[in-house]
C-alpha cells in the first residue's frame, strides 16, 4: 500500500494496492501488479468513500438529506461515489467538473452539471447550497474559478474528501469541517470492510498471478477475466450486490 516496500528487492515482484504508490516503482526491473487499475478498486474509492461522507456527516449531527442542495466538485472515482449516494439519499445534486470527465450514468443522477471554468454558475450554486464537498484531488480546485469569499459567505456546510487542500488559502481551515482534512477520517472505519474485501481479494490474486509464472517487468493491470470472476463472487455472496452496477 502506497509503495511502502518499494525499496526492497523482491525475487518475484510487487503487488501495489494504491494509485498514489505507482510512481515509486519507476525503473524497477520486475513486474508490478497494480490492483488499483481495475474496476474492482472503484468499489472502495467510489462506493466506499461516497458512503463514508454521509456517514461522517451523520456522526456530526447532519443526517437529514431529502431535498437538500449539494454541490460536489469533481466527478472522478470519489466524486462519482458522492454523486451516487447523494442521489440515493434524495439530495438535489449539482456537480462542478470538466464536461468531458463525467459519464452519462453519473450525469443522469445530477440535477445540474456546471463546467469547472464557469465562475458565475459556480458562484450561484455555492451561494445557495446547503452542502459543498470537494473531491477533485487538485489543490485549490474549488476556488480556481470562484472567489474564496463566496465560500466564506455561503451558508453551506463545507467539507473536503481529498488529501489536498481543495479550497485554497483564501478559505480558512476553520470554515471547513475538520479543518479541511478528509472528512471520513473522523470515522472509526473510514471505509467499511464490505467495500474493501473485493479489493483485498484482487490484491491477493495479484500475488498468485506473479507467483504462478514469469511476468514481464513493468506495470501489470488486472485482466478482465480475473476481475469479472471476483465480481461474480461479490454479486453472489457479498452484501453490496445491489450497488455494484454503480461502478
Give a label for each model feature.
Residues 1, 7-20, 131-177, 197:
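ADP-ribose/adenylate-binding Rossmann-like module
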Residues 1-47:
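Phosphate/diphosphate ligand-binding glycine-rich loop within oxidoreductases
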Residues 33-67, 157-247:
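Adenosine-phosphate binding glycine-rich loop
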Residues 63-87, 97:
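Glycine-rich adenosine-cofactor-binding loop
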Residues 73, 88-109:
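NAD(P)-binding Rossmann-fold cofactor-contacting core
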Residues 78-82, 103, 139-144:
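Short glycine/serine/threonine-rich phosphate/pyrophosphate-binding segments
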Amino acid at each position: 500500500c502506497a509503495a511502502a516496500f518499494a525499496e526492497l528487492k523482491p525475487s518475484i515482484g510487487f503487488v501495489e494496492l494504491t494509485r498514489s504508490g505507482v510512481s515509486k516503482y519507476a525503473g524497477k526491473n520486475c513486474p508490478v501488479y497494480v490492483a488499483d487499475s481495475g474496476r474492482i478498486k472503484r468499489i472502495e474509492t467510489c462506493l466506499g468513500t461516497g458512503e463514508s461522507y454521509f456517514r461522517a456527516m451523520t456522526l456530526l449531527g447532519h443526517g437529514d438529506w431529502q431535498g437538500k442542495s449539494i454541490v460536489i466538485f469533481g466527478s472522478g472515482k470519489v466524486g462519482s461515489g458522492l454523486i451516487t449516494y447523494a442521489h440515493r439519499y434524495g439530495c438535489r445534486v449539482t456537480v462542478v467538473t470538466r464536461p468531458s470527465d463525467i459519464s452519462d450514468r453519473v450525469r443522469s443522477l445530477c440535477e445540474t452539471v456546471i463546467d469547472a471554468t464557469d465562475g458565475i454558475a459556480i458562484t450561484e450554486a455555492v451561494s445557495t447550497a446547503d452542502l459543498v464537498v470537494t473531491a477533485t484531488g487538485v489543490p485549490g480546485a474549488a476556488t480556481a474559478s470562484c472567489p474564496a469569499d463566496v465560500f466564506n459567505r455561503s451558508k453551506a456546510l463545507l467539507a473536503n474528501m481529498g488529501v489536498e487542500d481543495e479550497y485554497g488559502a483564501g478559505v480558512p481551515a476553520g470554515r471547513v469541517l475538520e479543518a479541511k482534512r478528509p472528512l471520513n477520517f473522523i470515522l472509526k472505519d473510514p471505509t467499511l470492510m464490505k467495500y474493501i474485501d473485493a479489493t483485498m481479494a484482487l490484491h491477493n490474486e495479484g500475488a498468485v498471478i506473479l507467483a504462478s509464472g514469469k511476468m514481464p517487468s513493468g506495470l501489470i493491470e488486472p485482466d478482465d477475466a480475473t476481475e469479472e470472476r471476483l465480481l461474480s463472487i461479490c454479486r453472489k455472496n457479498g452484501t453490496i450486490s445491489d450497488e455494484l452496477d454503480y461502478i
